[in-house]
């Protein structure tokens, strides 16, 4: 979820340093390993612990206070609603899934025309201290018409309106049929399924 990036530097580096020192002293003093081996074992141990915690264990320690003050939990199934400038205001509703961990966030969904994926997602703090989900996506159009394209990309920026319900609203834009001046943009809303 790139939550790691939202941590204040003092906390981020303080926790890493304290855990590294404890692990190093464990190998050096308790197990009696030489200094270089203790350093090597410490690096390996910290890497493994960070991976396990960042991918799996963080969910069990992520309390509501952290969701409100640090970063919301974006994991789950969502309903996306877009209102596009295409053909005078096309409205589309589609399901999507967000998978997030401490270090990354990915999205995938099925639209009325095909599939959409997003591997570049980032959670940022806006100027007003609210949370925003910013991402780039690609869409594979399984049934393109003669005036459409089979693949296009886009970007979106959504503001978390309410952390408890995880409702988000924002804007999107695409390069869909840009060669013909028909690229699209509009409003997007995401609502988390309960």
Swiss-Prot record:
Listed InterPro entries: Cap15
Cellular component, GO, one term: plasma membrane
Membrane topology per record: Multi-pass membrane protein
Region of interest called Required for cell toxicity, as start-end residue ranges on this chain: 1-73
Main location: membrane
Keywords: Antiviral defense, Cell inner membrane, Cell membrane, Membrane, Nucleotide-binding, Transmembrane, Transmembrane helix
Location in or out of the cell: Cell inner membrane
Alphabetical GO biological process terms: defense response to virus
GO molecular-function terms, A-Z: nucleotide binding
Membrane-crossing segments per the record: 15-35, 43-63
Family: Belongs to the CBASS Cap15 membrane effector family.
Domain-related comment: Cell toxicity relies on the transmembrane domain; its replacement by a SUMO domain prevents cell death in cells also expressing DncV from V.cholerae. The C-terminus forms a minimal, eight-stranded beta barrel that probably oligomerizes.
Function: Effector protein of a CBASS antivirus system. CBASS (cyclic oligonucleotide-based antiphage signaling system) provides immunity against bacteriophages. The CD-NTase protein (CdnB) synthesizes cyclic nucleotides in response to infection; these serve as specific second messenger signals. The signals activate a diverse range of effectors, leading to bacterial cell death and thus abortive phage infection. Causes cell death in response to 3',3'-cGAMP upon coexpression in E.coli with V.cholerae DncV; inactivating DncV prevents cell death. Protects E.coli against phage infection. When the CBASS operon (cdnB-cap15) is introduced in E.coli MG1655 there is about 100-fold protection against phage T2 and about 10-fold protection against phage T5 and T6.
Record note on quaternary structure: The beta barrel domain oligomerizes; in the presence of cyclic nucleotides (probably 3',3'-cGAMP, but the cognate CD-NTase makes at least 4 other cyclic nucleotides) higher-level oligomers are detected.
Protein name per the record: CD-NTase-associated protein 15
Natural source organism: Escherichia albertii
């Amino acid at each position: 979820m790139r939550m790691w990036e939202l941590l204040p530097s003092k906390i981020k580096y303080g926790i890493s340093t304290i855990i590294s020192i404890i692990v190093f002293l464990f190998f050096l003093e308790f197990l009696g390993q030489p200094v270089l081996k203790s350093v090597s074992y410490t690096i390996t141990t910290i890497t493994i612990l960070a991976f396990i915690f960042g991918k799996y264990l963080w969910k069990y320690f992520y309390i509501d206070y952290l969701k409100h003050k640090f970063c919301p939990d974006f994991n789950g199934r969502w309903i996306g609603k877009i209102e596009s400038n295409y053909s005078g205001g096309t409205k589309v509703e589609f399901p999507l899934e967000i998978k997030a961990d401490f270090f990354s966030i990915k999205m995938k969904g099925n639209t009325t025309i095909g599939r959409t994926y997003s591997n570049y997602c980032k959670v940022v703090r806006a100027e007003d201290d609210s949370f925003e989900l910013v991402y780039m996506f690609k869409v594979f159009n399984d049934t393109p018409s003669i005036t459409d394209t089979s693949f296009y990309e886009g970007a979106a920026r959504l503001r978390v309106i309410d952390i408890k319900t995880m409702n988000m609203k924002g804007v999107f834009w695409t390069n869909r049929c840009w060669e013909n001046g028909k690229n699209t943009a509009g409003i997007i809303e995401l609502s988390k399924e309960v």
